[in-house]
């Protein structure tokens, strides 16, 4: 008789082939239809909240791998907290204003943007930004990211702009915002000021020069004739702006007389290096004094008709140069402050476009970089050049146009960070920084930073809501003007600032608080984009949900310590007088190629998330984000994704095995802990360990720990051991018998727990599992994310002594399998069920191991037809071997005796007339064979 139909084979609709690229869009459509995000919030409404405030990406390009990493990490956190009972609203946002969009519009339409009406230009920018919001949103949703996609926040929205005006107004009211003329980062190509966070450094070739300034007025302390102060600079073009020479007041300075008769003033610590640069081998020291000795002396500018003052400054170091520092207050922050102390008037001989002005004399009209060579040639010709050297240095560039930038003094609006710096530093104490070094980094950046330049000379930005009195020229910004402009922006949007004249924008009856004047002009600058994004926690989160402020978490790349993290902290302390707007701050690294190199279009090593989703599916992209320790840089390549696909299949196939063997299983079939077989309890105990690992991993945001633990659980504990042993019970035992129901109970608990715990990482696959499995009362079958993660099943757990016994069995099984493989290789057996294994202890360790496992069902656990424990020496005619885990264990593989059961293939000496072993005979007897 053919007993094939008496075997209970796996049956499930859960397919072996994932087909994620084809299957996921339909699942997304269903999730959107039932509004899974809303259901997730409703489930946990009224419970403790976990608020992850979204750092807004800039809306000027399609999503890249950095976006994919960032958004999936956020989704892991939102989903995992939702599945642990937290209320988790997640509102995605976008940063819209700024130079990159302006540049894109100008380039795309070949516009002369200065000739184009500002409202028209801004409308084009807004349409451009909205287009990329839509495209990026589509990409994020395709990744499976849950959020309030119907109501994202946008920094260009009317309500947001209205609230941001209030943020500015409050900081102005407190005296934190002022207008001043001081050096700032300036992009000549884009003709705008830049923030520190908008600067990138690149290595550029450079000519450094040593220049002689002839001493004029020495206050009677030195011989003036033929004596020169030697300065050193890498920015030749700034020499027209030189007004002073700074010395360190405590350092030793010397005047040396060279063989050529000239005398030079330099720092003693840098004397040898300076003389070597100038090719001077013979010289003698004729004077030695501290730097303060030379204070208030003057030196003749090498090519302009004015003198430079010798001043003292503590920041002058002996690391490089001559110790006599070229000081141009229009081009450097330290220079500016030093000259202010000495009441030296400011000059800025470079204009907005980076061209030398009339103040530069004969160099007027030259671009700053073009003037380098001309000035150098003139210095050589006049004899003022002491030396020059070629080298490479790290130089700041604009983050958007990639052009070199300059430092120049211009009238700008500033936020006086100095006024609340101590409070900002103190606020860092109440934040959980992940990694912990984030606190030190943030504190150092705040302590070291200058005042924040918040104005930009651009059109696509939030207008700075300040008026100027036409009578006295002073700025006017009052609570009344702020309230009025906020209301106007809330109703019409900020374009109204450019559509109306100043007198149409001021509140009725406004008079200048300084002079009583009644006519006004409006500010033309716009706010720094970092002020926009730094206000999101107020203009979006706090405005719409004041009870959710401060956010539980900010999560962005490590570059945001000087960007969004910092600007948000400063607006919180400055405008609100509160601490940090986040309780936890988590950072991730960069995405790099498979070799660890930065991905660039020019290198051709970029990877497009859309391509990966098309080829592998969103779940594999998410698995990539979860598998690496994202606190370091995360590598990305097609090869890595192929390997991840293999790991994914191990999880999927494990789930499919469980589901296939749960056909016909319902919650009422669950076996009580006291009735469950010990092997199944071992599996559930291992599952409990995984559950605890999952909770700890989610608590610590260490998703790679979880993915590796699940992979090991599927491969080591399940596939290589437990599931291998289980097949006989599942296929051949009585359908409703305890042994099979015990195994099914364990499989159910395993697949149910894995679907829940891995759902934040693989939402598509885990929901597919969820739809294919049986459920208990209380389960929300609509989507796995609407359910809680399971706690460890402690009632089913084995104690430590029992688990140690299973450790011994697993080690012994490995030893036996090694000898079985040898018997197979020697053609003594085919399958393991053709073997009869005899075990003999030759030392104390082996004897103890056999004593430990002697009462276990070794035949079933070793997957052979019979096992005996013996003291007899092995028969030399059989295949024998020693253990590895237990070297004193002698293992003999004999040919199994008896008849091979045609149903389960076990060999039995007690087969019935049909050749069935006793177990199979009993099971078959229960069946109605006529209906099979």
Question: What residue ranges belong to the model's regions?
Answer:
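Residues immediately within or flanking Cys/His clusters that coordinate Zn2+
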Residues: 184, 395, 464-466, 509, ...
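N-terminal catalytic cores of NTP/NDP-binding nucleotidyl/phosphoryl-transfer enzymes
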Residues: 42-103, 164, 231-238, 246, ...
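Alpha-helical recognition segments enriched in aromatics with Gly/Pro capping
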Residues: 314, 342-354, 458-460, 479-633
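Acidic, turn-prone loop/beta-hairpin segments
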Residues: 95, 184, 188, 194-200, ...
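Residue patterns forming the tRNA-binding/recognition surfaces of aminoacyl-tRNA synthetases
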Residues: 2-13, 17-20, 26, 30-34, ...
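Cys/His-coordinated zinc-binding microdomains
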Residues: 191, 457, 473, 516, ...
């Amino acid at each position: 008789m053919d007993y094939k139909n008496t075997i209970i084979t796996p049956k499930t609709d859960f397919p072996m082939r994932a087909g994620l690229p084809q299957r996921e869009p339909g699942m997304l459509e269903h999730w959107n239809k039932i509004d899974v995000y809303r259901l997730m919030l409703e489930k946990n409404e009224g419970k403790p909240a976990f608020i992850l405030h979204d750092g807004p990406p800039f809306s000027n390009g399609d999503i890249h791998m950095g976006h994919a990493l960032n958004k999936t990490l956020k989704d892991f956190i939102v989903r995992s907290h939702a599945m642990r009972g937290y209320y988790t609203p997640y509102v995605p946002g976008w940063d819209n204003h700024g130079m990159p969009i302006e540049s894109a519009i100008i380039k795309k339409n070949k516009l002369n943007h200065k000739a184009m009406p500002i409202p028209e230009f801004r409308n084009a920018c807004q349409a451009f930004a909205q287009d990329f919001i839509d495209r990026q949103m589509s990409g994020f949703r395709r990744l499976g990211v849950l959020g309030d996609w119907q109501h994202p926040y946008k920094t260009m929205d009317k309500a947001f702009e209205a609230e941001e005006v209030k943020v500015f107004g409050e900081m102005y009211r407190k005296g934190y915002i002022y207008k001043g003329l001081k050096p700032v980062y300036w992009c000549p190509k884009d003709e705008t000021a830049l923030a520190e966070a908008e600067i990138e450094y690149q290595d550029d070739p450079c000519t450094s020069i040593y220049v002689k300034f002839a001493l004029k007025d020495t206050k009677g302390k030195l011989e003036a004739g033929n004596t020169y102060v030697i300065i050193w600079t890498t920015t030749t073009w700034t020499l027209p702006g030189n007004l002073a020479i700074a010395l360190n007041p405590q350092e030793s300075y010397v005047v040396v007389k060279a063989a050529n008769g000239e005398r030079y003033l330099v720092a003693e610590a840098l004397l040898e290096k300076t003389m070597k640069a100038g090719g001077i081998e013979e010289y003698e020291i004729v004077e030695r004094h501290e730097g303060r000795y030379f204070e208030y002396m003057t030196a003749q500018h090498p090519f302009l008709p004015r003198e430079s003052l010798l001043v003292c400054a503590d920041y002058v170091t002996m690391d490089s140069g001559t110790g006599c520092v070229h000081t141009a207050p229009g081009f450097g922050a330290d220079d500016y402050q030093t000259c202010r102390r000495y009441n030296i008037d400011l000059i800025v001989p470079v204009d907005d476009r980076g061209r030398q002005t009339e103040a530069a004399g004969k160099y007027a009209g030259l671009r700053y970089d073009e003037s380098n060579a001309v000035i150098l040639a003139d210095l050589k010709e006049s004899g003022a050049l002491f030396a020059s050297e070629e080298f490479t240095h790290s130089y700041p560039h604009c983050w958007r146009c990639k052009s070199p930038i300059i430092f120049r003094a211009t009238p700008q609006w500033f936020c006086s960070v100095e006024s609340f710096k101590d409070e900002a530093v103190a606020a860092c104490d109440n934040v959980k920084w992940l990694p912990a070094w984030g606190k030190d980094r943030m504190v150092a950046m705040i302590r070291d930073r200058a005042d924040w330049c918040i104005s930009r000379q651009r059109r696509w930005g939030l207008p700075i809501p300040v008026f100027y009195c036409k009578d006295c020229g002073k700025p006017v910004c009052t609570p009344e003007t702020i309230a009025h402009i906020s209301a106007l922006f809330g109703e019409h949007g900020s374009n109204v600032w450019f559509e109306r004249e100043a007198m149409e924008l001021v509140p009725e009856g406004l008079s200048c608080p300084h002079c009583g004047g009644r006519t006004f002009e409006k500010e033309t600058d716009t706010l720094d984009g970092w002020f926009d994004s730094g206000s999101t926690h107020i203009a979006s989160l706090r405005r719409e949900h004041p009870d959710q402020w401060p956010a539980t978490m900010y999560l962005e790349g490590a570059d945001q310590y000087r960007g969004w993290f910092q600007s948000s902290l400063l607006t919180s302390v400055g405008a609100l007088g509160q601490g940090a707007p986040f309780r936890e701050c988590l950072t991730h690294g960069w995405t790099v190629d498979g070799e660890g190199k930065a991905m660039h279009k020019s290198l051709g090593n970029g990877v497009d998330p859309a391509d990966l989703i098309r080829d592998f599916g969103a779940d594999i992209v998410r698995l990539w984000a979860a598998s690496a320790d994202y606190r370091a840089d995360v590598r990305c390549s097609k090869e890595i994704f192929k390997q991840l696909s293999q790991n994914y299949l191990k999880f999927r196939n494990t789930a499919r095995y469980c589901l296939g063997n749960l056909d016909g299983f319902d919650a009422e079939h669950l076996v009580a802990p006291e009735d469950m077989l010990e092997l199944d309890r071992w599996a559930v105990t291992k599952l409990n360990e995984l559950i605890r690992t999952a909770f700890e991993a989610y608590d610590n945001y260490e998703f790679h720990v979880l993915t590796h633990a699940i992979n090991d659980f599927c491969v080591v504990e399940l596939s290589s051991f437990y599931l291998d042993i289980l097949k006989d019970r599942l296929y051949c035992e009585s359908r409703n018998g305890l042994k099979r129901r015990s195994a099914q109970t364990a499989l159910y608990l395993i697949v149910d727990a894995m679907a829940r715990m891995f759902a934040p990482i693989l939402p598509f696959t885990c929901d597919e599992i969820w739809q294919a499995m049986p459920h208990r009362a209380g389960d929300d079958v609509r989507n796995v994310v609407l359910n809680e993660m399971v706690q460890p099943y402690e009632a089913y757990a084995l104690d430590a002594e029992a688990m140690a016994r299973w450790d011994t069995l697993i080690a012994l099984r490995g030893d036996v399998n090694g000898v079985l493989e040898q018997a197979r290789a020697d053609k003594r057996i085919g399958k393991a069920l053709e073997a009869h294994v005899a075990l003999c202890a030759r030392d104390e360790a082996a004897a103890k191991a056999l004593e430990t496992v002697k009462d276990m069902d070794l035949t079933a656990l070793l997957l052979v037809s019979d096992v005996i424990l013996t003291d007899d020496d092995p028969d030399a005619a059989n295949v024998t071997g020693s253990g590895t885990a237990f070297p004193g264990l002698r293992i003999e593989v004999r040919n199994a005796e008896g008849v091979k059961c045609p149903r389960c293939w076990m060999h039995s000496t007690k087969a019935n007339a049909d050749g069935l072993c006793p177990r199979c005979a009993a099971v078959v007897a229960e069946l109605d064979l006529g209906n099979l």
